[in-house]
Swiss-Prot record:
UniProt catalytic activity: S-sulfanyl-L-cysteinyl-[protein] + uridine(34) in tRNA + AH2 + ATP = 2-thiouridine(34) in tRNA + L-cysteinyl-[protein] + A + AMP + diphosphate + H(+)
GO MF annotation terms: ATP binding; tRNA binding; tRNA-uridine 2-sulfurtransferase activity
Site positions for Interaction with tRNA: H125, Q341
Ranges for region Interaction with target base in tRNA: 95-97
Record localization: Cytoplasm
Family named by the database record: Belongs to the MnmA/TRMU family.
Role played: Catalyzes the 2-thiolation of uridine at the wobble position (U34) of tRNA, leading to the formation of s(2)U34.
Keyword terms: ATP-binding, Cytoplasm, Disulfide bond, Nucleotide-binding, RNA-binding, Transferase, tRNA processing, tRNA-binding
Positions that bind ATP: G9, M10, S11, G12, G13, V14, D15, S16, M35, G124
Active site: C100 (nucleophile), C196 (cysteine persulfide intermediate)
Gene name of the encoded protein: mnmA
Entry protein name: tRNA-specific 2-thiouridylase MnmA
Enzyme Commission number(s) of this protein: 2.8.1.13
């Protein structure tokens, strides 16, 4: 009987490298597949694709697996980056990693892997898959500090049924130990933190290459103009640094935070103080929903939710989950809930899915003075 073939997404990082080694040790027929999904500035100092490929080849040679590269740059631009720009243009703050996982890593990549004769695929994500009575659940990783289920919440049954997450049961420290013990050339390589496949770079400069500046007033809730913004697309709710209005103006010493965007008036509203009422919301609305099990949780269900990555699950109640819309009411006010980000629901360790935040209702309704 031939060995089960697993195609591993190898990025050149430690996690995917250890993933490939673990599966090789378990006796699988492992094939590494390196994705190139960005090529607008291959010669830029911020583009690490060339070095990443070198690392992949070096690791593959060391652990004894075949590896090849595939170019999904066109798919990435069409399915992920175009949406990224549309969202920013509309004043929202998207999370491209969520869409990249659903459309590229677990769709385009999965399809390509199946064409290579794969039985299943594997990646270095920190999450777990559990089969229960023929259905597949997405679970948080054992190492909650590295859990990536938030970014994977749009995966469906077909995708999860063909996916392995070998690192889901171990802490990141153990992964680093394994990398050092087996002599991986990238054992000390730092984790990537930039935009999915685009890398680490000055974000405002990068965005300005694709979206024009459109200056407008920066106002306080009482209507006072205190500065000028360069374009609403370049700011996100809860932002404290880089607003360009200096320090305290009321003697309190409290920092300024971006609180609202009025797209029609091209006005950016800022408030002072981390806990200003404009930054707090008890009700969150989301659309563009995706559920791991294929159906939404029942209305009235008490669950946990994240409205941003690395946030602790916040107790909430599903007030509505019908007609393509989701409304969550939280027990405690949530801070700087940002349209464009994902609201992801959890039942304990199980990630149920979620949607894209469309709006948040402030804990205290205060109308801005124009």
């Amino acid at each position: 009987m031939s060995k089960k073939r697993i195609v591993v997404g190898m990025s050149g990082g430690v996690d995917s490298s250890v993933t490939a080694w673990l599966l090789k040790q378990q006796g699988y027929d492992v094939v590494g597949l390196f994705m190139k999904n960005w090529e607008d500035d291959d010669d830029s100092e911020y583009c690490s694709t060339r070095q990443d490929w070198i690392d992949v080849v070096s690791v593959a040679d060391l652990i004894g697996v075949d590896v090849e590269a595939v170019n999904f740059a066109a798919e990435y631009k069409d399915r992920v980056f175009a949406d990224f720009l549309r969202e920013y243009s509309a004043g929202r703050t998207p999370n491209p990693d969520v869409l990249c996982n659903a459309e590229i890593k677990f769709k385009a990549f999965l399809d390509h892997a199946m064409a290579l004769g794969a039985d299943t695929i594997a990646t270095g994500h920190y999450a777990r898959v559990r089969e229960v009575d023929g259905r597949f659940e997405l679970l948080k990783a054992f190492d909650h500090t590295k859990d990536q289920s938030y970014f994977l919440h749009r995966l469906n049954q077909a995708q999860l049924s063909r996916t392995l997450f070998p690192l889901g049961e171990m802490p990141k420290t153990k992964v680093r130990e394994i990398a050092a013990e087996i002599g991986l050339p990238n054992a000390k390589k730092k984790d990537s933190t930039g935009i999915c496949f685009i890398g680490e770079r000055p974000f405002r400069d990068f965005l300005n290459r694709y979206l024009p500046t459109k200056p407008g007033p920066i106002k306080t809730p009482d209507g006072k103009t205190i500065g000028e913004h360069i374009g609403l697309a370049f700011y996100t709710l809860g932002q404290r640094k880089g607003i360009g209005i200096g320090g305290s103006r009321d003697g309190t010493g409290d920092a300024w935070y971006v609180a609202r965007k009025d797209m029609a008036a091209n006005t950016l509203y800022v408030v002072q103080g981390h806990d200003h009422p404009w930054l707090l919301a008890h009700t969150v609305h989301a659309d563009d929903l995706s559920w791991v099990a294929g159906h939404a949780p029942a209305e009235g269900t008490h669950l946990g939710a994240k409205t941003r990555y690395r946030q602790a699950d916040a107790p909430c109640t599903v007030a509505r989950a019908a007609g393509g819309a989701l409304t969550l009411t939280f027990s405690e006010a949530q801070w700087a809930v940002t349209p464009g980000q994902s609201a992801v629901l959890y039942d304990g360790e199980v990630c149920l899915g979620g949607g894209i935040i469309s709006a948040a209702e402030p804990a205290v309704v205060e109308k801005a003075i124009a």
